[in-house]
Amino acid sequence: MNQVWLISMAVGSTKWLRKLALLLSLPISFISALGLRPAQAEQIGVIPREVLFGNPEIIGVSLSPDGERISFLAPHKGVLNLWVQDLIDGAQPRRLTNRTDRPQDPAFWTPDGRYLLTSRDANGDENTVLIRLDPVTAEAEELTPGEGVLAGIVALDRRAPGELVVGLNDRDPRYHDLWVLDLESGKRRLLHQVEDGNQVGAAWLDNAWRVILRKRIAADGGIAYDLRLPESKEWRPFLEFSFEDGLSGSGPGSFERSGTWMYGTLSTEGDLPRMVRWNRETLKTCELNCPYELVHQAESGSMDIGLSDPNTLLPQVLVETDLRSRKLILDQSVAPDLKALEKLAGSRQFSIVDQDLEGDTWLVVFHSDRQSPEYWIWKRSEQEALKLFSVQPSLDQYQLAPMESLELKARDGLRLPAYLTRSTLADQGPQPLVLLVHGGPQARDYWGLNPLHQLLANRGYHTLSVNYRGSTGFGKAHLLAGQGQWYAEMQDDLVDAVTWAIETGIADPERVVIMGASYGGYAALAGLTRDPELFAAAVDEVGPSNVETLLASIPPYWEPIRKPTERMIGVGKVDLAEISPLNHVDQIKRPLLIAHGANDVRVKLSESETIVQAMKSRGLPVDFLVFPDEGHGLVNPRNAIAFYGVLESFLSRYLGGRAEPLG
């Protein structure tokens, strides 16, 4: 179909959907196309898009410092707003915001519980304004400048509950200077002005708001850290890391509350990270390569702090994540609590997402691949659990598909951790497959409830997500194997995964679609231009089509990470024009669906417009959706529901699955 459909989507408007439904819909006998028994298809109901991608009943829960209240997001007149509720029997929630256009951002409490802090931007432009909310009166006050300024919360401390350290790029859009903000008056004072690219992170302030660490990125992408303890007047070199070690997570963290130990992560002597700590007395005199103590060596995947003592700030629980996650206890005082929560979780996993100032009340989320997440309260002193909410309870009435963890191999032997969700409609035999590519590309896919996997499984498609080389979370070698491999070995990994699915009888070789957002969208475009015979169609959401223009238009505040980004892409070593799908449009033979937010500052709308125009001029089939009130991704559930409605019809047309009607 040689036609472009440019759709500007107004919130609440469905006329364009009905019109598009007439264009996209064809009579489809999906039962015969998928080899299903009619009774089987009838028994498994269609999960509505509204259930999968609409507003959750509740999400973004935060526990007050005294453990007696929660804030959360819940719908009001169809839009997520912020609410607060006391944790006592019979207490009713009270709404604090009145957003009518775009979902409210989550909030969290100041250390004294006096205020809630939240944020907003303008339709996805990422110019974030910080907002102070009174949880009693609902009075709101903007704390930071608006237009053209990206504000971020850097630090809060219980010993200075009336203050907040924020980062603002109002002086120079490339860099975030640090300011101490008075929460009552809104007045601010300069704490640290970035000079020569020296950046300061959240963990690198002491309890008197003094900067003790700074970092700078070298010309080759390496990272250097300088240290200045409060008792010293001069900065001196502390740590230096190569580009490879810095990219894979090596760096200092923060002091625990007594100031005796500074914690950090190193990946300098192996493939997997290790947690270390430096003694303050040693730091007073050493320079570079200071001796440290080993806290824990990761055995697989990534390593994060899962729980810290709120009084001492010492890490209590570590979480290692490979294909699945596991917890490691550093502080045995919490062992009985974790054992009780594991018993309560059953086959599910759980995360401790918040706690009160005394560490007695925990906010816990239980989650799995086939059940709506649940928020619970765990009282340590009483060893009792209280269920608060299910995020999307209506989802639990439908048959959901399990997510399988896989160990695939690339053609050069590299391990490819992957996840497969099989169609809930399929009998034995090859089925249509959607290869869903994650963005980043320095990111990863995880095991768990994935609404898009569930949508596709419910409509009759297998879905495969692959952690290709360059993904994070699977060791330094796996990450660095992606260096300079856009349009090359990173794409080979995706092709190898599809080949495996075909050779094992999982995928129908004539019905494979590649789909993704951001870098995943780029990979979808690369799939159509580099391997035009392999994929029946492609779906690109906010993906770049031209690597040269992508790098030329990155936001100013990305300048500090420009060099590492360019090194991973391979600037100076690879032909950027050659790895840009736009320059291979003449190779496209299959249909393409593109969606983009008009306010995207990371991947400009022009990245999609140019390839659409190039395809249109050649009479190639492309469907193009523009969302005027979105940025880099679809935040508004109404837009997400609309997009996935178009996606369903697109896939049904080219793969033969079923689809919930549009409109």
List the model feature ranges, each with a label.
Residues 20-33:
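Bacterial N-terminal signal peptides
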Residues 54-59, 77-82, 99-105, 110-417, ...:
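Peripheral, non-catalytic segments that deliver or gate enzyme domains
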Residues 468-663:
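Active-site-proximal cap/loop segments of hydrolase catalytic domains
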Residues 39-41:
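Boundary at the C-terminal end of the N-terminal hydrophobic targeting segment
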Residues 43-76:
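Mature N-terminal segment immediately following signal peptide/propeptide cleavage
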Residues 73-96:
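Beta-propeller domains
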Residues 394-510, 517-518, 523, 551-560:
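Cap/lid segment of the alpha/beta-hydrolase catalytic domain
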Residues 1-17:
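N-terminal secretory signal peptides that target proteins for export/translocation
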